[in-house]
Amino acid sequence: AASDVYKRQKHSFPTTQIDHYDYLAAIFDNLKRINTILIDFNRDIWQYISMDYFTQSVNKNEVGSSAMPHKVNPIDFENSEGNLSFANSIFEYLSGKLPISRLQRDLTDSTVLRNIGVPFAHTVIALNSINKGLNKIEVNKKTIDEDLENNWAVVAEAIQTILRRENYPKPYEALKNLTRTGKKINQERIGEFIDKLDIKESNKIELKKINPSNYTGI
């Protein structure tokens, strides 16, 4: 085993003194990018929970708020976000510090290297918190369906795309005049708009089949 390790050793040709640590900087930068994606994920889930798109199972041993006992906070995702942010600040420092050394021989790297484990530990804690949080949430289909039903304007994109396919003149402007009036867009108004279009009846039938629940943007 020792022989195999020895064979894998390579000279670091750019330096004649301490190692240049470029490989460590690359690792830390990559981990920081991964953590940034997870921070964004945590914030998205937090937002979906606040919008009631996801519900959380209640743990009677957890305290949601010191003032409001009824609150069920997304504490696992908040915990994860905090740990990932802290880990990233250290990863950024390490990747910027370690490649720098006075004439490739100062010892500032020695104390810094002793703290490499810190951001990894916070990242592991964050990952565990994400897993814990995901196991506590469920999709609230009722709220999502209600939200979709109250937002018929989302089908305007699909209608415009089909009108372009049929070479309908200025479809964007037609939908803009419908949707940007300050008035609520509902199924009835969409239907009235479609009925007034100068297109084939088969196209009108196709357009009326589109609704917020079955249109996915494709």
Residue ranges, per PLM feature:
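Short, small-residue-biased leader/transition segments that mark boundaries at the very start
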Residues: 1-6
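Short, surface-exposed helix-loop/turn micro-motifs enriched in polar/charged residues
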Residues: 15-16, 55, 171, 186
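Generic secretory/membrane-interface signal
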Residues: 13-14, 38, 105, 207
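Glycine-rich anion/phosphate-binding loop at the beta-strand->alpha-helix junction
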Residues: 16-102
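Catalytic-core signal marking the mid-to-C-terminal active-site face
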Residues: 63-218
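A short, charged helix-loop
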Residues: 7-16
